[in-house]
């Protein structure tokens, strides 16, 4: 292949990877794979400088602003850093800048694997925040940055203007928690903490960002009015004084040998840190000499990023173990030929879902490339098809649940396969906890500790077994005397008379919450009728969408679920909802807001009284609110209602409106 063609091919491939990495937050190759492409391109351009162009990945920072956010033009370009892949590269860097710099002392910092940001403060107050983007134009993420608690909205000391650069990252434990949550919901997981941080920071709704424990470190002053500094070490202390989050894991290094020692130390300690790092950043300490050295179009000449060697190992995929999660999700786990990786011996790895298995073309018997996502979770990066013998076997999703043999289902728009059997042994405890919860069958005294004992002692193997329990059996449980047992049996019996909407909620049908269960039970008054209805019938009901309808059809098509419902009926559990006559829809078209504590009604009871009469309960006050029902300690909702001159009712007035006084 001609040199010019190979250079063009490398640029196009890297631009594709830049798009997937920076814009979609879904990398197609590992960082080390990308670095190899960059090294090859750099080498070719050095040998054939006539082919260097202004838009080559070696000449600019990768990435561009997403169209979802307002673009922000950086007052000072946010450049990238040149990479060093060996200690020899660092020594060469030291020699190169030694030709200009008179004092070769450095600041060594950890290279956080996150998202670069620029923060601007005016008169000590956070004005705006932007991502790096292409180095010249980034994305305005101010609203989301404000949700990160480590970033101060006001500095300890006021300066006319301060612009700093930093990195937003996701701690390892939050990365694990978030991916577990996404797996339980049947959603695609994040590949690594960097992508999780990017995906969380670039949410259109700041509340989503706030729900994810992002953190940040600030490491450079880009511009400052009202203060002059001489060294990076001094800048670090000054940023700390201002209350900005600086990483304590930094070191002033008198020479390049001290830098090498710092790098060696953290190559060993990196797995002990609560966040992911992929190298060490080395910066000339003297700021005036940085000015003399200057920068290329892509990177400063006075700094370099040493990248740790990729911790990846090859091993063989021996088989796949299929497990059922607590919410019924079918989860594949890779069984591997044991291999030592990043401090531990690895013999198993999460495969997340069958879509990823297909995308990566993983087969039983394959040689695969393994790494640890977030330095913690073993994960297969890719298969190595060039090493196949032809005897490898394709991995396919199971048709039946491995725990209970029920048919598995998959919903539109989800990557997960699920077991729909509510009595599946793998998900029984969670099903029971939800069934007994306040918003469902509301069985007082039946908490997780009691359920744990009931299931572990085989006293409850299915949901309907709850209604077969005897007082003397419960008395034998730990911390359950005769009085507690009698109260629990009473609560179980009382739950039999709950309305159909509560039972539909309690069954834990995917996408069917308390509100949609109430809507369904207003239109369909007998649980038996759900057996006959298809998606088209259900979507004709107002507010019931295709996902809800599909979920209902799948649930009632499962024979084991039908059996449970029939047994619940036989045991005296109500499965009907009385049809409400048109005349009884007293509150049709009326919107209520509840605030404060009512003397005798819980908020849930008041809500049910409103909804059963055709009214709607809202969580916020507006001009469209018909009534505000206020109890003790009502808070700001009452203030707003008074401001808007809305009708305000106490409990007595509310009951009178309903004809229950």
From Swiss-Prot:
Its EC number is 6.5.1.2. It is an enzyme of class 6 (ligase). Its cofactor is Mg(2+); Mn(2+). Keywords: DNA damage, DNA repair, DNA replication, Ligase, Magnesium, Manganese, Metal-binding, NAD, Zinc. The active site is at residue 111. GO terms for cellular component: cytosol. Pfam families: BRCT, DNA_ligase_aden, DNA_ligase_OB, DNA_ligase_ZBD, HHH_2, HHH_5, Nlig-Ia. GO terms for biological process: DNA repair; DNA replication. NCBIfam families: dnlj, PRK07956.1. DNA ligase that catalyzes the formation of phosphodiester linkages between 5'-phosphoryl and 3'-hydroxyl groups in double-stranded DNA using NAD as a coenzyme and as the energy source for the reaction. It is essential for DNA replication and repair of damaged DNA. This is DNA ligase. It comes from Syntrophomonas wolfei subsp. wolfei (strain DSM 2245B / Goettingen).
């Amino acid at each position: 292949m001609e040199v010019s063609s190979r250079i063009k091919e490398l640029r196009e491939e890297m631009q594709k990877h830049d798009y997937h990495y920076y814009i979609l937050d879904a990398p197609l190759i590992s960082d080390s794979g990308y670095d190899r492409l960059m090294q090859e391109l750099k080498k070719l351009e050095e040998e054939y400088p006539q082919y260097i162009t202004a838009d080559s990945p070696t000449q600019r920072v990768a990435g561009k602003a997403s169209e979802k956010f307002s673009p922000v033009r950086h007052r000072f370009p946010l450049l990238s850093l040149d990479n060093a892949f060996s200690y020899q590269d660092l020594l060469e860097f030291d020699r190169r800048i030694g030709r200009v710099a008179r004092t070769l002392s450095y600041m060594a910092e950890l290279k956080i694997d996150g998202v670069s940001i620029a923060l601007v403060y005016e008169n000590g107050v956070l004005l705006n925040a932007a991502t790096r983007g292409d180095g010249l134009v980034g994305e305005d993420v101010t609203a989301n940055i404000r949700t990160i608690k480590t970033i101060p909205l006001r500095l300890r000391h006021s300066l006319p203007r301060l612009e700093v650069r930093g990195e937003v990252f996701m701690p390892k434990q939050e990365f694990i928690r978030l991916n577990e949550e996404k797996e339980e919901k049947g959603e695609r997981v994040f590949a690594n903490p960097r992508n999780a941080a990017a995906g969380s920071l670039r949410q259109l709704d700041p509340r989503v960002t706030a729900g994810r424990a992002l953190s940040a470190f600030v490491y450079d002053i880009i511009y400052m009015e009202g203060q002059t500094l001489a060294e990076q070490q001094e800048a670090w202390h000054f940023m700390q004084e201002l209350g900005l989050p600086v990483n304590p894991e930094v070191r002033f290094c008198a020479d390049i040998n001290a830098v090498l020692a710092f790098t060696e130390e953290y190559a060993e300690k990196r797995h002990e840190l609560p966040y992911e790092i992929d190298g060490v950043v080395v910066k000339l300490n003297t700021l005036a000499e940085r000015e003399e050295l200057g920068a290329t179009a892509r990177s400063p000449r006075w700094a370099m990023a040493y990248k740790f060697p990729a911790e990846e190992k090859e091993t063989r995929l021996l088989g796949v173990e299929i497990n059922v999660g607590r919410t019924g999700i079918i989860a594949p786990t890779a069984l591997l030929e044991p291999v030592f990786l990043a401090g531990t011996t690895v013999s198993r790895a999460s495969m997340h879902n069958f879509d990823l298995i297909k995308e990566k073309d993983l087969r039983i018997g394959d040689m695969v490339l393994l790494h640890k996502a977030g330095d913690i979770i073993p994960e297969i990066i890719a298969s190595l098809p060039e090493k196949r013998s032809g005897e490898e076997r394709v991995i396919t999703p199971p048709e039946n649940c491995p725990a209970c043999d029920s048919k598995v289902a998959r919903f539109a728009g989800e990557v997960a396969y699920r077991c729909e059997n509510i009595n599946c042994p793998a998900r029984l405890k969670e099903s029971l906890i939800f069934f007994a919860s306040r918003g469902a069958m509301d069985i007082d005294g039946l908490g997780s500790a009691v359920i744990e004992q009931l299931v572990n002692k085989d006293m409850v193997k299915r949901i309907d077994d709850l209604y077969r329990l005897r007082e003397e059996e419960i008395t034998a449980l730990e911390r359950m005397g005769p009085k507690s047992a009698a109260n629990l049996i009473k609560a179980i019996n009382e739950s039999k008379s709950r309305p159909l909407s509560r039972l539909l909620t309690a069954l834990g049908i995917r996408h069917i919450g308390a509100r949609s269960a109430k809507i369904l039970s207003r239109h369909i008054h007998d649980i038996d009728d759900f057996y006959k209805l298809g998606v088209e019938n259900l979507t004709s009901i107002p507010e019931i969408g295709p996902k809800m309808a599909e979920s209902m059809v799948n649930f009632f098509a499962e024979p084991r679920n039908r059996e449970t419902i029939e047994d619940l009926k036989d045991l005296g559990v109500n499965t009907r909802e009385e049809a409400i006559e048109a005349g009884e829809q007293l509150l049709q078209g009326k919107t209520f807001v509840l605030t404060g504590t009512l003397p005798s009604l819980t908020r849930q009871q008041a809500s049910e009284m409103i909804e059963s009469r055709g009214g709607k309960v809202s969580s916020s006050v507006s001009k469209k609110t018909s009534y505000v029902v206020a109890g003790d300690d009502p808070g700001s909702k009452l203030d707003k209602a008074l401001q808007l001159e809305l009708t305000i009712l106490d409990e007595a007035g509310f009951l009178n409106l309903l004809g229950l006084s």
